[in-house]
Regions:
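Single conserved hydrophobic/aromatic residue that forms the stacking wall/gate
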Residues: 1-11
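Conserved short acidic donor-positioning loop in nucleotide-sugar-dependent glycosyltransferases
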Residues: 20, 96, 147
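Conserved active-site helix of classical SDR/Rossmann-fold NAD(P)-dependent CH-OH oxidoreductases
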Residues: 53-60, 93-98, 126-127, 153
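Alpha-helical segments that scaffold the active site and NAD(P)H-binding pocket
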Residues: 60-65, 97-101, 134
């Protein structure tokens, strides 16, 4: 259906949302836009990573056939309000927010707590996607993320502080924690958008998420 509707000028520019999960666990701490099929996707999200790889490949082929300007974005750890809560399958921030607000005590987090990730609020992600679509450069492949990282232990403590909760925090080192540091090289992204990447701080974003959760659950 996409390939047939793409014949219209309305569809001559498309954006496909991939994921940073396509990248392998090996490589630098700050990941640039790497080759799509370089080694296997990260182990903790391997199925999802492969699905996104094939999505990129499929739409890249269709865009060439239909002469479409295809923008492919690879977001890193996006969070925000209106998140779909799916229990143990939720990503880190929404899962921790829910468990802390549900008064789970002790609170058990996976891994050592020292693993570091970069996080970007959904507002900034959507804003950046809009700027990418407005950019005249064709056939863009770009990461959406930041170089700045925060440890899981610090993330837990921030959520507890903002929510006014004080559970006993335990870290289960028998559970997988993925690569130790995962962040995004922002060189290409900064060139494309010509604007700041982060406008919603991690503290402000978590506060928004907590308030939304309280109002809706």
């Amino acid at each position: 259906q996409w390939s047939s509707s793409a014949a219209s000028d309305v569809y001559k520019r498309q954006l496909i949302t991939s994921s940073s999960c396509i990248y392998s666990d090996e490589g630098p701490d700050s990941l640039g836009e790497r080759y799509l099929f370089e080694k296997e996707p990260e182990k903790v999200n391997m199925g999802y990573g492969w699905a996104k790889r094939f999505l990129e490949q499929k739409f890249s082929i269709l865009s060439k056939i239909n002469n479409i300007d295809l923008k492919i974005v690879r977001p890193f750890n996006i969070y925000g309000e209106r998140y779909k809560w799916v229990g143990g399958y939720s990503s880190a921030i929404p899962m921790l927010v829910k468990r802390i607000l549900d008064d789970e005590n002790p609170l058990i987090a996976w891994g050592s707590g020292n693993q570091r990730r970069s996080y970007l609020h959904a507002f900034d992600c959507a804003r950046i996607m809009h700027l990418i679509m407005e950019n005249p450069k064709k056939n863009i492949v770009v990461n959406i993320g930041t170089k700045e990282t925060i440890s899981v232990s610090d993330l837990v403590r921030i959520i507890c502080k903002i929510s006014g909760k004080d559970p006993t925090i335990l870290f289960d080192k028998t559970k997988p924690e993925g690569r130790f540091i995962k962040s995004s090289d922002t060189t290409i992204l900064s060139e494309i958008i010509g604007d700041e990447i982060i406008t919603v701080s991690i503290e402000e974003g978590i506060k928004k998420m907590i308030n939304w959760y309280i109002e809706n659950f």
